[in-house]
Structure formats: C-alpha cells, structure tokens
Amino acid sequence: MTEIVTALIEQAACQIILDADGINALAAHKDVLQRAARPVVLTPHAGEFARLSGVKNASPEFLAQFAQENRCVLLYKGHRTLIAAPDGALYRNHSGNPGMAKGGCGDVLAGMLTALCGQGIPAVQAACAAAWLHGRAGDLAANTLSEYGMTPSDMLGLLPRVLKRYNSREW
C-alpha cells in the first residue's frame, strides 16, 4: 500500500486527500509530500499524527511547522479541529462537540472535504469549510439527538439543513 500512496502523491494531477490508513502508509515516507505536484491534504487524528510525525500531543505551533516543512495541508481532527496550511497559517474550527468522537465521523469529514476539493475549491479553504460544516452538522445532531445518541449517519443526514441556512440563492 505504501508504494501505491507514494506513487499517487508523486504522479496525481488532482488533489490528494489522505485519511486513516493512507496516512499510516505515508508515515515512513513523508518526504514524498515535498515532491507532490500540489499540497496533499492529510486528515489525521492525534494517534495518526503521532505515527506520522513521531510527536504525541503536538502543539498548534508544531502542526503549523509540520505543514510548512512538508508542503501539506493538515486537518488535525479533534474537539477543536485545527487546519495548518503550507504557508504556515493556522486556523481553528470552533464548531463541533465531543459526540463527534465516534468511528465514522472522520469518514464523513473526509467525504465532505473531497466533495469541496472536487468542485475546485482550494485545499486550505476546502479544509476550513469542511471542518466548520462538519462541526455544525455535529452540533445540530447533538442538539436533536444528544451527543451520546448521535451517529455519523445522523450528521450526514442533517448536512442539507446546515447548508440550506447558508444558501445564497432565492428560489
């Protein structure tokens, strides 16, 4: 799998987004990030980032430094998701809640990020937007179903309500 991930990063003409095992496959070869045609988006939680960087409990400053040194966009998942850009900028998402710390929530986020990048939105902006929209859907799910009762599928189902509020078109 490592060879496939490395080859994709080096050769792909489209935006690459790596989550979960894609990040784990990259851990021993993170130098490939510097050879990518465009900044790769990585979406690790703390454990995945520790395997990738060798640093547990990374500070926001370290995340920004990592993104800058490795020419990547880092969407560091947590209760307050952080987005670090290749230029060293750091963004903090303030939507979301602890009920989102469930298996599958990161998959929903990765799918949202992929959809935004697929529409041509630049990676950093797409990462910030996906994190915020994901968190708002999580907040709506928690308000409706409770943090304990909500599931990633509930969040996905509530996403149209979140988007409708910010739709600029009058129908």
Regions of interest found by a model, annotated:
Residues 1-95, 164-171:
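Glycine-rich phosphate/dinucleotide-binding loop and adjoining beta-alpha-beta core of small-molecule
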Residues 57-60, 99, 103, 149:
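Short, conserved loop/turn and helix-capping segments at secondary-structure boundaries
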Residues 51, 102-133:
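Short, small-residue alpha-helix embedded
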Residues 47-53, 94-100, 110, 114, ...:
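Short beta-alpha connecting loops at secondary-structure transitions
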